[in-house]
Amino acid sequence: MSDRQAALDMALKQIEKQFGKGSIMKLGEQAERKVSTVSSGSLALDVALGVGGYPRGRIIEIYGPESSGKTTVSLHAIAEVQRQGGQAAFIDAEHAMDPVYAQKLGVNIDELLLSQPDTGEQGLEIAEALVRSGAVDIIVIDSVAALVPKAEIEGDMGDSHVGLQARLMSQALRKLSGAINKSKTIAIFINQIREKVGVMFGNPETTPGGRALKFYSTVRLEVRRAEQLKQGNDIVGNKTKVKVVKNKVAPPFRVAEVDIMYGEGISREGEILDMASELDIVQKSGAWYSYNEERLGQGRENSKQFLKENTDLREEIAFFIREHHGISEDSGAEGMEDPNLLD
């Protein structure tokens, strides 16, 4: 046995010398290690994700119908990474990035790396180069459906290109997944929804780009509008449901309900008020909301406005919500500058 053990030790040393420390290890060595995360920018979504945010070094897919809030959810994640001193990149394949809206959500547009590629191959190669640099903490690709293969762009309008985009995504993800894990980059792929023709039973909806992204994603989020939010006769936003359809780091199928206000993004006050009411941190009596016997306001909108004006009180309530769910603030802030600190 000792000869076999010595041979194994020598082989392990050779592997580590050739491929670097940590390239092979015993499974139990990392059993105690927590998943390093970065907040999604939404407290309700952090709780639904189960680990306090998006796991670093993993692939996330965010999909849903048009104008459901997919890009808004992604921009909040970028703003959170930048707030913690990290570097962010946005691959705008749809050529629809609105810098004014991004700025309102808290994104530092002077520091955000932006690329608007001509072809799908170009967009994915740029993403790979940024990930392999090890200096980017989050990269958002908007969207998979807009990553059109070069052959399709150069071909005629009626030409058939069956499975071309699926093959492109499959090859790209095979190359990207290892680099994403090593660099601790959060890679968010935004995707659209398509209808499968002739489906009689089950869900006819599917996402473009083949099956590869479904397999490689650690987390898949489905974003859908639930109802409109009105102030008088004016529509001021949407109540949006974000369902965690797949989760490899915590139990899946949890749902986060958030208010996405037009021109403002996710309402922090709205989600804090709803979650605190559920946990009885904030008491609701009739139409009145109160906290520690102090009245916040009559009706939800007035209470939201009160919390918006009193940020110290808002963050105090948020602290108790985090404490209840066992989530620490800025859980991924440490090591944001240097991914090697997490190795």
From Swiss-Prot:
Keyword Glycoprotein: no
Subcellular location: Cytoplasm
Any GO BP: SOS response
Keywords for this protein: ATP-binding, Cytoplasm, DNA damage, DNA recombination, DNA repair, DNA-binding, Nucleotide-binding, SOS response
Short name of one Pfam family: RecA_C
Positions of transmembrane segments: none
Domain of life: Bacteria
Keyword field contains DNA-binding: yes
GO CC annotation terms, alphabetical: cytosol
Gene Ontology molecular function, alphabetical: ATP binding; ATP hydrolysis activity; ATP-dependent DNA damage sensor activity; damaged DNA binding; single-stranded DNA binding
Family: Belongs to the RecA family.
Cited PANTHER family: MITOCHONDRIAL DNA REPAIR PROTEIN RECA HOMOLOG-RELATED (PTHR45900:SF1), RECA (PTHR45900)
NCBIfam families assigned to the protein according to its UniProt record, in alphabetical order: tigrfam_recA
Protein role: Can catalyze the hydrolysis of ATP in the presence of single-stranded DNA, the ATP-dependent uptake of single-stranded DNA by duplex DNA, and the ATP-dependent hybridization of homologous single-stranded DNAs. It interacts with LexA causing its activation and leading to its autocatalytic cleavage.
Name of the protein in its database record: Protein RecA
Organism of this sequence: Bacillus anthracis
